[in-house]
Amino acid sequence: MAAQPPTGIRLSALCPKFLHTNSTSHTWPFSAVAELIDNAYDPDVNAKQIWIDKTVISDHICLTFTDNGNGMTADKLHKMLSFGFSDKVTMNGHVPVGLYGNGFKSGSMRLGKDAMVFTKNGETMSVGFLSQTYLEVIKAEHVVVPIVTFNKHRQMINLTESKASLAAILEHSLFSTEQKLLAELNAIMGKKGTRIIIWNLRSYKNATEFDFEKDKYDIRIPEDLDETAGRKGYKKQERMDQIAPESDYSLRAYCSILYLKPRMQIIIRGQKVKTQLVSKSLAYIERDVYRPKFLTRTVRITFGFNCRNKDHYGIMMYHKNRLIKAYEKVGCQLKANNMGVGVVGIIECNFLKPTHNKQDFDYTNEYRLTILALGEKLNDYWNEMKVKKNAEYPVNLPVEDIQKRPDQTWVQCDACLKWRKLPDGIDQLPEKWYCSNNPDPQFRNCEVPEEPEDEDLVHPTYEKTYKKTSKERFRIRQPEILPRILPQINPELLYQTSVSSQSFSPVKESVPRPHLSEVTSPFAARIINLNLASPASEPENSSMKRKLGVHSSILNAKTRRLSNPPVENSSYKNDDDEDVIILEENSTPKPAVDLEVKSDIEVKSEQSHTEQSGIHVDLVSSPKPCVQASSTSTSTSRSDPGITVSTQTDAPGLTVKKEESMEEDMGVRNGTATLSCVGTEAKVQETSAESVDATSHQLQELRSELLVVTQERDDYKRQCQMFTDQIQVLQQRLLEMNDKCVKKEKCHQSTETDAVFLLDSVNGQAESLDHLGSQYQQALQEIERLKRQCSALQQVKSECSQASCTESKSEVDEMAVQLDDVFRQLDKCTIERDQYKNEVQLLEIEKSHIHSQCEELQTEVEQLKSTGQQAAADGSTASNAEEPVSYVDGESLKLRSLRVNVGQLLAMIVPDLDLQQVNYDVDVVDEILGQVVEQMSEISST
């Protein structure tokens, strides 16, 4: 029956089976261990160290977790053993990891069936018992947690509750007496701390799920036994097709990366875990910035290469300084092409929500967008580093195989737990490192705060030149794609017909719009855009044409619908250097009233505009018309007596001739580019006077656009002239260098092209394309020959300079090496001196402490002697002889126990002292103590 409060409304019951059900959220055992580590890390406990060990108690293998944090009161321990109580808050910038008040229950019950918690906070000491075995034995219907509380003098508080809880603990736990419980409390060093003991560990094939034998300083997950392949390493479920990193099966490796910036030391089986600043222990470190739309701030992403193992790569995703997902592959790393190998990314996703086992994030839209953005950022970093490093190391090794070292070396002080940056070249560090060992005098004191990090969250630390060059390369290679994709375009995608309403013609008119940009070569013209017009989709006062870009000129004409295979453009059929981008817009039918005026005026205006800009347009009718459209469309158009728009289209050739004259000193002749397009005819019966204003407005816009294009063409001409002058200056300098370095060679041969060029220029004849091509090839050959001569001269010059400077360089190098050795020895001596100073200081402190203890013991011995003598004197004068004897015996017993303690203390100071041969009933120990005190006083005075 569930408990009933005074109001009579029942409380919800919690079945003991829920302890096991709740623990199944941890499919990976190390995630349960991490929950217990998080409890010691959180700011309410704020432990500096946590010890994780394996021990045996009453023939049971146990896991122990001991920390030196703030401990807990009995009430706080009760909330910890209950469900959903979490009052953790941020303290001094330390953000808690725990969110749900469920970590200890799920983690401890995942590792074993029974757990005991020992804690003390300086005032009280408490013992709590959470056990599935105990609840099964007593057949409990609710979760029951016995808790015993002691005061500083080891006396129980709240006797009624504590006695019942103590009886349950002594009967059903590994500790059968109260003294054993107090001994575990004494195992907590210091006045505050917590100790957790877990037993009845989860088993797998008649053994625990942990391997304690392979590495005596680690806790590992054993290898899987495969019947066909033998033993194979453990892998997490999501990494079955990948190389498993060591953190998947080694608790020591997992704890080293568990926190983005560790604030606590973790000691596993007696050996400290070498925690690392994950974002600082990479090579070729660069930072990028992620600007999500669902956040008002930016997020920093750190990229770098793994220096230890290139097969361990991916994104390390942290939440509030705690690792959630490790080595998550994104972007190009998901492809089987060895891209992104060795690249590690670090991001702190405080804006995402982790699952309650803290091993994944909720699969929300924000998470998907973040993963997508991480993939793009990683691709940028990979492409940039691949180009940069392959240029720096021109060898056959890819960038992921180049030997790398971390960009920076950081170490954590064992006293203040602050992170300090070390200079380059320090490889070996002592087992315990303190701020006083820092070569940098600015950070040689534990009181000095940590070195500030780069807080620029707006700009990346590297320029993405690869992306810029890729865009530029695509822009340059754009003309190469047009001839290849133009024959493959399905005409049904370009020319689609639609059925209109009864009051409109069943036709959509398409208008091809070839945009002629500036001609970058005298042998080719370039098509930029091909659009389908939408006459009815825009207001009447606006132009039917799309706004032109700054770099293009326009040539538009009205066409009728083509319903059969597309017209092939022979001028681009064999051109491999050009490109076209086809943009298709759906158009809606419109009454044909406006079409005649608009089409006629557009053709005329474009002809006049092109004549002004130097472009000649000739309309040449094709001898063969295009294939007729379907009879259905034709008959439908004829059924309307008021409006008739024919769907039959002819294919006249529209020849565009553009001639540009370049300056004579450039050596470039006039080139002719011919472009054939689809001509159009629009037959209409009525015209509208209202469309004249709209057409004039269109003409005005076209004139302004043509003026802009003409101005830009003139600008490009001026730039071309400037670049030509620069090329001539460079060629002149190159010739002067050749004249200085080699003897002049006279060539009595003349080239035929020069003569032909002069003859044609005199006669006013234009050169053919073949002549221009041959001249261009000869110019290229001449440039290559000059380049080879220049490189040969440079090589000769460099060899001469190397031969003269080799001896001097060798001497300078030897001196530099010697000087470097001297500085290294000096640094080493300085470090050793500081270490010795620290050891001397520690020894002096220990010596003074021992001296004070000796003095206290000596005074106590003297007091006991005086009381003993006084008691003996009083006993001799008393009438009854038996009572003083017993009193003296009690004093002598205290004196003997005190001498035993003094003897143990003296054995630590005097190693040669054999306590087994010492008689504690006489004053031998007192004399030895006096001698040691005299020697210590003499040493301190000297």
Curated annotation (Swiss-Prot):
Alphabetized, the UniProt keywords read: Chromosome, Coiled coil, Immunity, Innate immunity, Isopeptide bond, Metal-binding, Nucleus, Phosphoprotein, RNA-binding, Ubl conjugation, Zinc, Zinc-finger
Compositionally biased residues, Low complexity? 630-639
Question: Is Nucleus there in the keyword field?
Answer: yes
Instruction: List the SUPFAM superfamilies.
Output: ATPase domain of HSP90 chaperone/DNA topoisomerase II/histidine kinase
Subunit structure and binding partners: Homodimer. The sumoylated form interacts with PML (via SUMO-interacting motif). Interacts with TP53.
Please give the function described in this protein's UniProt entry. Nuclear matrix protein which forms MORC3-NBs (nuclear bodies) via an ATP-dependent mechanism and plays a role in innate immunity by restricting different viruses through modulation of the IFN response. Mechanistically, possesses a primary antiviral function through a MORC3-regulated element that activates IFNB1, and this function is guarded by a secondary IFN-repressing function. Sumoylated MORC3-NBs associates with PML-NBs and recruits TP53 and SP100, thus regulating TP53 activity. Binds RNA in vitro.
UniProt name for this protein: MORC family CW-type zinc finger protein 3
Native source species: Mus musculus (Mouse)
